[in-house]
Amino acid sequence: VVRYDYKGIEGLQLSANYNFGQRHNDKGRALTPGLKNAFGFGALYTAGDLDARFAYGHTNLETNATYKHRVDGFLASLGYKFGDFKLTGDFGYAHVKFDDAKTNKFYVSPGFAYQVTPASQVYGNYLYERVKGEADKDKTHGFLLGADYKLHKQVVLFVEGKYVTT
């Protein structure tokens, strides 16, 4: 991987990367399918209580045939903090092409976090996801609610519950 980060403007970070081919994971096991190459770029902007992020990625996967297998996707996230209460919104889209088959994926996930004490917070979000292939269309709705407690700067206990329907 080759990566470049630009941090010349206060509150703004721009990043770009190129991933070379990879046929094995970190433990030496074969990846199926292998990574032919990939690139991505993103931007993070923070000003006061506002946090905005955007990323785009393109991945070419290896095939042993003449057709292509690729994945394109983007992610956008926006968050704003009102004292101890934070609202967030995540949005994503992916397009997968495998030979002549195409699949489009979309999700939106608004959420919140409330800092109850300096060591504890409650958080939750809603998820709507749609996956549309050549012949099928699936929708998912989900809710997540959780709480955490920070015992130490590197130790956090948490409990979460979720409900998902398709």
Each language-model region and where it sits:
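Surface-exposed coil loops of outer-membrane beta-barrel proteins
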Residues: 1-39
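Outer-membrane beta-barrel biogenesis signature
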Residues: 1, 151-158, 166
